Amino acid sequence: MKKVIHTDDAPKAIGTYSQAVLADKFLFISGQIGLDPTTMELVEGFEEETIQVFRNISAICKEAGCSINDVIKFNVLLTDLSNFQKVNEIMEKVLEKPYPARAAYEVSALPK
């Protein structure tokens, strides 16, 4: 059985998807970009966008009854892999050890 997770503290879905779906004990969170949930606009600057992504994920986790520190894997998509170290620094600030598994990819563009 699956349960759709939605919170007003994260950006509403802008396509044919849910913010997250809880299936048994697993929470599947849709990809996030640095959208402010109140304005639905991207925040400015790479670091602020990244921090906003983690705020959005945290809000979704909270709505599902868990914490961002319960996440077991992140897939990080970057349009410029030179920002990878900044992502590491931000993750170190917002996550507790032990850190989750992670994969990072450089992509040509991200949707909005």
Where are these regions (language model features)?
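Short, polar/acidic, helix-capping and beta-turn segments at strand->helix junctions
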Residues: M1-K112
